[in-house]
Amino acid sequence: MNAAVETPEILVFTDNAANKVRELIDEEGNPALKLRVFVTGGGCSGFQYGFTFDEEVNEDDTAFEKNGVTLLIDPMSYQYLVGAEIDYTEGLEGSQFVIRNPNATSTCGCGSSFSA
């Protein structure tokens, strides 16, 4: 595993996102959980984002820590997420995790699909 780093120029994990993840982990009652963010093929624009909780840290994962929360990214997904911002927003249309990705050449209206 690559060391946990606080490097905003590589990836921004906002306070809002970290605090919401902490709240969700507390609700699960398992402090070993970490948030895994990944990119997979699919969606209407070619790639889509995914979020899951994971207790396992793979040797080649990159880990980011913020407010006591660990964010994990696998090497394939990492290349698509460099420079991205992971945020949590609440508004009239509901609440959701949002990825603002400067590497995306286009995005879908659903907000979870992009092309690079």
UniProtKB/Swiss-Prot annotation:
The superkingdom listed in its UniProt entry is Bacteria
Coiled-coil segments on the chain, per record: none
Q: Name one GO molecular function term.
A: iron ion binding
Q: Would you kindly state one Gene Ontology biological process term found in this protein's UniProt entry?
A: iron-sulfur cluster assembly
UniProt: iron-sulfur cluster binding residues: C44, C108, C110
Q: What cofactor requirement does the entry state?
A: iron-sulfur cluster
Q: Which UniProt keywords apply?
A: Iron, Iron-sulfur, Metal-binding
InterPro entries, per the entry:
FeS_biogenesis (IPR000361), FeS_cluster_insertion (IPR016092), FeS_cluster_insertion_CS (IPR017870), FeS_cluster_insertion_RrpA (IPR023063), HesB-like_dom_sf (IPR035903)
The free-text note explaining how the cofactor binds reads: Binds 1 iron-sulfur cluster per subunit.
Function of the molecule: Required for insertion of 4Fe-4S clusters.
Q: How does it assemble?
A: Homodimer.
* Family of the protein in this entry: Belongs to the HesB/IscA family.
Q: What is this protein called?
A: Putative iron-sulfur cluster insertion protein ErpA
Which organism was this protein described from? Answer: Azoarcus sp. (strain BH72)
Q: Which gene encodes it?
A: erpA
